[in-house]
Amino acid sequence: MKQIIQLCLLKIYALVERTGLLSTSMGRSLFFAAYGWYKLFIEVGNIRSLRSYVKPGEIVIDIGANVGFFTKQFARWVNGSGFVIAVEPEESNYRQLLKNLNNSGTAGVVRTVQGVVAEQHGTLKLAINPVHPGDHKIAAEGIDVTAFTIDELVQQEKAFRVCLMKIDVQGAEERVLLGAQETLQRDHPAILIEIDDDALRQMGSSAERVVTLLMDFGYVIRKFGKNSQMDQISLAEALGMCRNGRYVDLLFV
């Protein structure tokens, strides 16, 4: 059902985009209001359940921040000396992210990074999807973007513990985790990941590789969804949820 609603909304987005309405201030405002409603009530489930993982003075990392729906939520939870690191590569999304943080009064506790997260520092290509503002992805061709590793981003922040990471990077999830091994070993943050086996396979990875990698670091898998009790599930159950072109949100703790 979630995928059907998303496809319908994307078709509407493509039609409206052709009218030029999205280039106007009112059009953009309406779109982002609708996007926020979709994220909150359709896609992300019980986001408030993640709050228990955020302690005073700790770091939350939002990888694939888009325009900041999760970032704003996380920023309201951190306190003391804690802060959020939000990473988003695409220019228009990044500008809207900054605007949304300023408008929500949360910019003071968010450190934004324009780029992608991968297994090593460097320059990669980002393929832009003209009809899906949340589907830009690392590819062989596209615009140049700077790539960072998680371990690099927190290198100067070792006095702080990374308590929570959200990863939504259109199939590059394994690459993100490979560049975060020191952080995973040291801090063992809770990790919310959107897993799409088809997208992962297009990048030479798979849902099984991502889940197994995290289990090797001592993580257990929990369901994450609307009204979910976040029950622990097995590897086989997790992989079964990813079959037939479905993508799922899983929480690793």
Predicted segment positions?
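Phosphate/nucleotide-binding beta-alpha loop and adjacent structural elements of enzyme active sites
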Residues: 1-253
